[in-house]
Amino acid sequence: MAEEQAQPQLALERIYVKDMSLEVPGAGVFTKEWNPELDINLSSNAEKLDDDHYQVVLTVSVTAKNAEEAAFIAEVHQAGIFLLKDIPEDQIGQILGAYCPNVLFPYAREVISDIVTRGSFPQLLLAPVNFDQAYAQSQQQVDAEGNA
């Protein structure tokens, strides 16, 4: 009797805010008309916890300047524990680099919006991000550097 092929399993087992902060360097920003310039940075990293579990942390940083003055710096490290069991090795990078950040982003977006409004600034809703495209571009860059 032939052994059954194990079915791949992919699941989010836990989601949590690993770290978050809001810095408002000066109160003078509240006395000026609000017309901010935003600088948004995203990054993610993955850490293998055991044979089947990975922690993926999506970091979202937003720096707002208003009239050339720093208004706020908001940052969240949104984390998730993911089960990846019997996943083909060639698919793990794509899952950790694109799928998991796609899952985490709406939660990080909500935290950023919440802490910014709690700082008495207007609501900030970050636009959706195509992590699949970003991952593909990063892989192309790695491949190009490897061939150089």
Curated annotation (Swiss-Prot):
BP GO terms, sorted: protein folding; protein tetramerization; protein transport
Keywords, comma-separated and alphabetical: Chaperone, Cytoplasm, Protein transport, Translocation, Transport
Xref: PANTHER family: PROTEIN-EXPORT PROTEIN SECB (PTHR36918:SF1), PTHR36918
Quaternary structure note: Homotetramer, a dimer of dimers. One homotetramer interacts with 1 SecA dimer.
Role, per record: One of the proteins required for the normal export of preproteins out of the cell cytoplasm. It is a molecular chaperone that binds to a subset of precursor proteins, maintaining them in a translocation-competent state. It also specifically binds to its receptor SecA.
The family this protein is said to belong to: Belongs to the SecB family.
Name the UniProt record assigns to this protein: Protein-export protein SecB
Species assigned in the record: Psychrobacter arcticus (strain DSM 17307 / VKM B-2377 / 273-4)
